[in-house]
Amino acid sequence: MLSDLKQNLRSYFSSRILILALAIASIISVCTTFYVISLEAKNFSTIIGFLLIDLAIFLILGILLTQKFFTKNNDNDSSKLQNRIVIAFSLVAAIPTIIVSVFSVYFFNLSVKAWFDKKISTVLDQSVIVAETYIAEHKVQLKETALAVAEDLSDMYYDLIHNPALFTKTLNTEADMRSLDEAIVLNKSTNTIVANSYLSFSLSFATIPAHLIKKADLGEPVEVKSDPTTIRMLIKLKEYNDVYLLVGRLVDNKIIDHIDATNGAAAEYNSLKNEIDNIQIKFSIMFIFIALLLLFVAINFGVLFTAKIVKPIKKLVTATDKVKDGDLTVQVPENEVDKDEIGTLYAAFNRMIKQLSRQQRDLVIAQRAMAWSDVAKKVAHEIKNPLTPILLASERLLKKFSSEINEKSEFESYLKMIIRHTNDIKNIVSEFVLFARLPAPKFTKSELVYLVKHIIEARKLLNDNIVYTYDSNVDQFDFMCDATQINQVMINVLKNAEESIEGQEFGKIDVILDAKDDFISVIVMDNGKGFPPELIGKATESYVTTSSKGMGVGLAIVKRIVEEHCGVLDIANREDEGAIIDIKFDLKELHLKVRRSGG
């Protein structure tokens, strides 16, 4: 059995660890898949492989969770509730997730279409075209200017070729007149600057690509791209030998920045537009995996949550089945549940079972008492009739013939024995009658302290070999009761104590009256032989006795009277010697009963 328990525990924890490991692996796998999809250099075989791994992990996780749940609950009828709750949790998680997923994908696609609408693409393209047109127009104007300056310089060839100062002055005049930011005349053969305007930057043929110089040799202006903020044109001067004119015009920085921003935005927009399919795939995959993960979490949470709810209900169902089979000793553990509705239900169930057990016990006792009551009536009737003539005949024989018989002492002894045993039988019959015909109490206001003390004094006179003590925390106490029946209670209890002391050298009976809150107790303690342990729980049942002088109805009568007065009779043995009988009356209940009865 111990090995089976270890095996079950090992299997339980291994399955939980496996499920936890798979859950962690699923999260790592999804994140890795997303990373692989996000890479610029995509390997679709790798992406498909990771997607298959994700799907396999989720399928295994789902199978394990389903198997764990349904295997645990398959053989138990009470698991139907747990199954319904888990299914409800799954539906509550799945339906909104599916709805949100569908609408999210739908609105995401709508949003993407709105972002990459044709109108937006047209606006961006037009912006780029406007920017390019602006630059192109500047280039065309600069080309025309370069041709015009080259023409002027060629016309003045003979005046300028041998006069560098005039060449420089003429070049500056052309630059000022045509709004050029720079103008440079370069000699290719000597790689020197022949003339330049005042604000021109130093430049040599080494910085101009060879293929541009070849194009310039054809006589057409060629654009030289060396600085994004300046447009430059290179043209060969016709009349000069290997001499070239380089003119340039600055472009406003704000315009350059605006053009760069426009081109950058357009390029990024087109890049995103080309990647839109991949973005949609990423979003859909991530949303599907997150939805599945949420579904599995909801199922697992449903299993744990329902286990917490259904487990105490199962215990309650099991306990109810035991009660149905007649076991009224069963109790459900209240300390294992929270102090909520389940805890309240547990407490109510335990109270109900205790009450049923007590009522069943009382019913058995009442049925037994009723049966014995019927027997008592018949026996008392049958015995009482011959008792009186026997007793009278014995007394007359003793009176009439005791003086005439020689063996007088033996004759008297025999007759007295007959009389004594006849009286014993008569007392037994009286007990039978009293038990069978115990009337309902007639409640009147009585002074309890006086009643108890009066009975103690009477018992002292009958038993001078027993020491009686009395103690009370009240001097006077008005008590609603049937005084005759309370007298009977005290007499029976004290008589029971006296009989247990018989045969001892020193006997002592302590009587304590204790009034506290809404209760008053009458406690009787003796130093006798006490009750046999096996009879403690049965001492108040009818015809259970340890005495040879009665039929065991004394304490049964006491119990009936005490209960009629809303009290409880508690019987126990003292630790050292003797017994203790505690009679405790509930004054609130007693007053309510008296009020209901019209007393």
Swiss-Prot record:
The chain crosses the membrane at residues 17-37, 44-64, 85-105, 285-305. The modification Phosphohistidine is found at residue 381. It catalyses: ATP + protein L-histidine = ADP + protein N-phospho-L-histidine. This is Putative sensor histidine kinase NtrY-like. It is found in: Cell membrane. GO terms for molecular function: ATP binding; phosphorelay sensor kinase activity. SUPFAM superfamilies: ATPase domain of HSP90 chaperone/DNA topoisomerase II/histidine kinase, HAMP domain-like, Homodimeric domain of signal transducing histidine kinase. Residues 378-589 form the Histidine kinase domain. Coiled coil: none annotated.
